[in-house]
A protein has these predicted regions:
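Basic nucleic-acid-binding interfaces
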Residues: 2-40, 49-85
């Protein structure tokens, strides 16, 4: 099982992981063709340059782990684009 497969398995498990980091999210999103772009302040967006699909998120600080609603938004976005089922 590849590292991306392991990260995806952790991302979609129930209950949502409490220790999924921003760096792990960047790896997953990059795998699906998304690029991380800076917004104002802690706002970040992932844009798929091929499909122009955007995922808008707030990067928490100083702790960069994702919280439940962020994980749900990411899962919904990836499902809507057909990247995960």
């Amino acid at each position: 099982m590849s590292q991306i497969d392991k990260l995806l398995t952790r991302l979609v498990r129930t209950p949502a992981p409490r220790d999924f980091t921003w760096q792990q999210l960047v790896k997953v999103m990059t795998h699906f063709g998304y690029e991380e772009l800076e917004g104002s302040g802690s706002r970040k967006k992932f844009v798929n340059l091929r499909t122009k699909h955007k995922v808008l998120l707030h990067k928490r600080h100083p702790d960069s782990t994702l919280i439940g609603p962020q994980i749900e938004d990411i899962i919904d976005a990836l499902k809507s684009q057909g990247y995960i089922s």
